Amino acid sequence: MLMPKRVKYRREHRGKMRGRAKGGTEVTFGEFGLQAQNASWITNRQIEAARRAMTRYMKRGGKVWIKIFPSKPYTAKPLEVRMGSGKGAPEGWVAVVKPGKVMFEIAGVSEEVAREALRLAAHKLPVKCKFVKREENGGESNEN
């Protein structure tokens, strides 16, 4: 299960999920990717379930990159506890995902296999997802 080795603070504010993803919006490592279409928290358990679904479908073929990391702790109070008396205990870890973020990448398999593996992974996640391919820079050069 993914989680930070150590954190500076045990509890965090929930925060707002406004706007689109700043970085990580393109396929960089692999050939195909799974891109988020809306914002959500994705838990470390959901990330692991998606990873297992992909690797199981690809059977030993190909390579998978997980481009999100659950670095935000979320807290919960026990059931049937009255309001107040402090913030709850840390319950788990989440990755904040905004629209446009590429969450998983795959390489080393055909497009049909990658499409199906990423579709299976998308079913494990609480966000609407889109299959994306790597864009090759055609002829454009930034060098002077």
Curated annotation (Swiss-Prot):
It comes from Bacillus cytotoxicus (strain DSM 22905 / CIP 110041 / 391-98 / NVH 391-98). InterPro entries: Ribosomal_uL16 (IPR047873), Ribosomal_uL16_bact-type (IPR000114), Ribosomal_uL16_CS (IPR020798), Ribosomal_uL16_dom (IPR016180), Ribosomal_uL16_sf (IPR036920). PANTHER family: 50S/60S RIBOSOMAL PROTEIN L16, LARGE RIBOSOMAL SUBUNIT PROTEIN UL16M. This is Large ribosomal subunit protein uL16. The gene is rplP. Keywords: Ribonucleoprotein, Ribosomal protein, RNA-binding, rRNA-binding, tRNA-binding. Belongs to the universal ribosomal protein uL16 family. One of its GO terms (cellular component) is cytosolic large ribosomal subunit. Pfam families: Ribosomal_L16.
